[in-house]
Amino acid sequence: MRLSRFFLPILKENPKEAEIVSHRLMLRAGMIRQEAAGIYAWLPLGFRVLKKIEQIVREEQDRSGALELLMPTLQLADLWRESGRYDAYGPEMLRIADRHKRELLYGPTNEEMITEIFRAYVKSYKNLPLNLYHIQWKFRDEQRPRFGVMRGREFLMKDAYSFDLNEAAARVAYNKMFVAYLRTFARMGLKAIPMRAETGPIGGDLSHEFIVLAETGESGVFINRDVLDLPVPGEDVDYESDLTPIIKQWTSVYAATEDVHDAARFEQEVPEAKRLNTRGIEVGQIFYFGTKYSEPMKAMVAGPDGVDVPIHGGSYGVGVSRLLGAIIEACHDDAGIKWPEAVAPFRAVVLNLKQGDAAVDAACEKLYAELQAKGVDVLYDDTDQRAGAKFAAADLIGIPWQIMIGPKGLADGKVELKRRSDGSRETMSPADAVARLVG
C-alpha cells in the first residue's frame, strides 16, 4: 500500500477529550473518529488492526472446537422476558420498537437468542457437546462512556456459548475456553491473567476475567507475581485431552479482582515480596451458569434414559474492539504505538527519505515490489514530507519494522532497518532487509 493513496488523517496535536494513552494515540494515528458519545467510525488503519485481532480470536475459537455462526444485532424483547432479564438488565439496554410496535432491543449479549436457536433444533444428548460463537457488534448504553474504545457504547465482541448435558461436561467446555483465551491473548503479545470474578448480570457461580495489567485499567486486582511467569499452552495443545492440570496450574496461584478479593487469604498465601496490588484492563470473561437460561426457556434434551433435562450452559466473551486499546496501553512509548507483529496494520514501512531523487525512488520502488512479491504486508511512504515528519509518523502508527532509504546510505548500497519495539537499528543491503522480513 502506498501512503500517498492511503487514508491516514494523522493529528498533530493531542486531542483534548482523550484521557488515556490508547484513546489519544488512536485518535492521533487516524485509527478512529468519534461520531457520538462512545460510538466510533473505524478508519482504514484502525480497521486493519481490528480485523487482525478478530482473525486471531477466530482461529483460536476454531482450534478449540467451537463453531462460528452469526446472530443479528436486534433481538425480540419477548426472548429476554422468558429468561427474566428484560426488566433486570437496566438502562444499559437500548430498547426500541419497529413500525408494527413490536418490542426489540439492540443486543448487549446473546444468551437468550442462542438458547432459542439451540432449543429449536437440538433434542437429544447425542448432539452434545456443542459450542457456538459469533463475532458481532453490540451496544450497551453506558451512562458515562469514556476512554475511547475501552469503554464505548458500541463495541465488537466475540461471544461463545456452550451446551452440555451436565455440570461435569460443562466444566470441560469451560476449561477449553480457558485455555483458548490464554493462547488468544498470548498470540497478540499480551500477558492476560485469568482471575476469579463476579458473574454480574450474566449469572452463574463460576467466572474468570482475563486481565491485562495497566495503570489505566478500571479493575483493581490482587495477584501473586508468580502468575506472571506461568507458561501459556503451545499450538500443539490437545483440546480433547484432560486440560485440568493446566487450569489448576493457573488457578492455584492467587489472582483476583477487587470484587472477589479475599484480603486474609492473600496475606496468608502470598509472601509479601510477591504481592502485587495494581490495576488492569479486562479483555475477556468466561462464565459457567448451569441451567440459568435453559430452565426458564425450556431448552431441554433427552438424556440417555430418555428423560428430558435442561442443558448446562456457559458463555465466553472477548472484547475484540477493546483489545486495540488494551494492546496500546501495554505497548507504547512517548513517540507512539509499538504494535506486536501479529496485530500490526502493516509488518513494515518503507521510508523514502528523498522523494524525487531518481536513485532513491528506484530503490524504494524495487524494495517495495520485492516485499509485496514475498507476501510481506508493507506500507510505502512515498509522500513528499520531510524525513523528520516521516520518522515521526512511522513511530506514531507503530509499524514493527521501518526500512529507511536515503541517498547517503544508498551510495554504499545500504539501507537502514529499524525495529520499532526496541529502537534498534542495523545497516544492511536491500536484499538482506528483504530476507530479514521474510524469514
UniProtKB/Swiss-Prot annotation:
Signal peptide: none annotated. One of its GO terms (biological process) is prolyl-tRNA aminoacylation. GO terms for cellular component: cytosol. It holds the Pfam family HGTP_anticodon. Its EC number is 6.1.1.15. The keyword Zinc-finger does not apply. It is found in: Cytoplasm. CDD domains: ProRS_anticodon_short, ProRS_core_prok. It is an enzyme of class 6 (ligase). Its main location: cytoplasm. Belongs to the class-II aminoacyl-tRNA synthetase family. ProS type 2 subfamily. NCBIfam families: PRK12325.1 (NF008979), proS_fam_II (TIGR00409). Catalyzes the attachment of proline to tRNA(Pro) in a two-step reaction: proline is first activated by ATP to form Pro-AMP and then transferred to the acceptor end of tRNA(Pro). This is Proline--tRNA ligase. It comes from Bradyrhizobium diazoefficiens (strain JCM 10833 / BCRC 13528 / IAM 13628 / NBRC 14792 / USDA 110).
